[in-house]
Curated annotation (Swiss-Prot):
InterPro entries: Flagellar_assembly_factor_FliW, Flagellar_assmbl_FliW_dom_sf. PANTHER family: FLAGELLAR ASSEMBLY FACTOR FLIW (PTHR39190:SF1). This is Flagellar assembly factor FliW 1. Acts as an anti-CsrA protein, binds CsrA and prevents it from repressing translation of its target genes, one of which is flagellin. Binds to flagellin and participates in the assembly of the flagellum. GO terms for cellular component: cytoplasm. Keywords: Bacterial flagellum biogenesis, Chaperone, Cytoplasm, Translation regulation. Its main location: cytoplasm. Belongs to the FliW family. It comes from the Bacteria. The keyword Amino-acid biosynthesis does not apply. Disulfide bonds: none annotated. Interacts with translational regulator CsrA and flagellin(s). SUPFAM superfamilies: BH3618-like.
Amino acid sequence: MNYFLKAPILGFEHINEVRLEKIDSLFSRLMGQTNSPMALDMVLVNPYCLREYSFVIPKYIELLLELDSHSKVEVYCVVVLQKNLEDSMVNFLAPLVFNSKNGFGAQVALSMMDYPDFGFRDPLKSFVVKERERA
């Protein structure tokens, strides 16, 4: 699905339209819809599949995305891929929030002070191991 960014993705402020494609229930791919030489193509992860994950969406983001009780909100975190997938890093402090009802999206920058259990370079393997231990 295509989304219009109402608040930019950090480092990609020049991109205002993106395409989100689900790979599976865990991973998705986000691509910038631009001809810029600084293209956007990143892997995202559903944080709720990895860990307990909860944060307050700031009021200004609620307003920008026109969120209400009928909105279908999707949240993803950026994955920095490594050669070995389990060595990849997840950024839980800058989630991407999408309202699929109206096609709006935004990145939210969370404070480490407010969310001390969230990291910006949490290794994916620490969550994979936990999942294996549950099995």
